[in-house]
Amino acid sequence: GVPSAVSKDKSFIYSSPNLKGLENMDLGHLLKDALGIPAFVDRDVNYLLMNDIKNFDLDPDKDKTILGMYLGTGFGNALYVNGKLFSGKHGVAGELGHIPLMGTKGLCGCGNTECCELKCSGKHLQELREEYFPDTCIDDIFTEHGDDPIIREYIDTLAYPISTEITLFDPDYVVMAGGVMIMKDFPMERLIEQIKQRTRHPYPAEDINFIYPKHTQTSGVIGGALAYFASEK
């Protein structure tokens, strides 16, 4: 799994904002040639979502709509509909971190401007720490500054893209994870409150089922295997 936009045939990496060395690389075929076995490449968050669905038994009947929100260095998003990952025409569906957020300034790693990932990401959290809380370790930023207006605005901004996608898909479950969301004292209650406030009422706002997994280093590996077997059916 890679933090990148990957082709429909699970081989070519189109864009990788946070790992530039992977861009425009046919990684799937390179791995196949090197290993002598078929190799499939996909976004890492797709594999994480497949692992989470299995661990929490979220879709035994293969008829659910499940959204994955993974806040790490960037803002990862995965879509699962009726037993399958949804990838769209070109394989790049679910790039929620790269929808425009009006008023956002700066150039995103993807090459666009106004991408919400410029505000909704672990990278931006680190920028806030460096500018406003330079004496605080990043691991303690929510513990020491969770009630600061700067951090509250950061959390509130996260709610906009998440609530937008929930309103669009009316999902059965929304998985909330990633390195930032599992940080010590992350204000999840406030984030959920803001998401519900901004989601369409009465539904889906009044019936959102959030799931909070804890990942290990093998989560994506297992999810990759699950995704492969699901694609072969």
Outline where the language-model segments fall.
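Short glycine-rich anion-binding loops that position phosphate/pyrophosphate groups of nucleotides
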Residues: 3-5, 72-74, 180
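ATP-binding/phosphotransfer module of carbohydrate and carboxylate kinases, centering on a glycine-rich
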Residues: 6-12, 29-37, 53-63, 103-107, ...
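A charged helix-plus-loop insertion that forms the helical arch/lid used to bind
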Residues: 10-24
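Short, acidic/small-residue loops that bind anionic groups at enzyme active sites
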Residues: 24-30, 97-101
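General beta-strand structural signal in soluble alpha/beta enzymes
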Residues: 39-44
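Acidic/histidine-rich catalytic cores of soluble enzymes
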Residues: 48-49
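Glycine-rich phosphate-binding loop of actin/hexokinase-like ATP-binding domains
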Residues: 63-119
